[in-house]
Amino acid sequence: MTEIKTIKKRSGFRVMAELIGLVKPLSGYMCLAIFAGLIGHLCAAFITILGGYAVLAVLGVQDKITPMQVFITVPLLALFRAGLRYGEQSCNHFIAFKLLALIRDKVFRALRRLCPAKLEGRGKGDLISVITSDIELLEVFYAHTISPVAIAFLFTLILCGFIGNFHPLLGLLALIA
């Protein structure tokens, strides 16, 4: 009697967790990407926030920062934002392409072991094309999903804390929203 192995269907969450687990050897680059992205987003947010402070200063409502300080700080924040964005994207794509090379290597090594005849004959181009296109889809996940989600989470917490400095209920309302 032949034994038939059943393949367990994995949930999308489990697959995503396993894909994230592959990043572990490159976690330093991932932390750098998250840090650069977070600081860059804070720079972008504070361009607008400081503009609001400048308006309030002109109206005489606040005196913590002068309009001249805002006019000096805003262009610097914009320059920092540009450099940090570049750094974040560079780290994300470095991670993505390193992992794609690793995954491709593992997949093709397994294919050579499991079905060497299929890789020699007709249709090998179709098989390789399908596998390569599937692996390429992972680039989006590694370069454009993991760190942006972490950045959004941390950015939200920081800005809710900032808003909460004005009044704790405002910070809580921002967090709920």
Q: Where does each model-flagged region fall?
A:
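Juxtamembrane helix-loop junctions of ABC transporter transmembrane domains
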Residues: 12, 44-52, 77-120, 124, ...
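Short, hydrophobic secondary-structure boundary micro-motifs
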Residues: 31-32, 66, 119-121, 140, ...
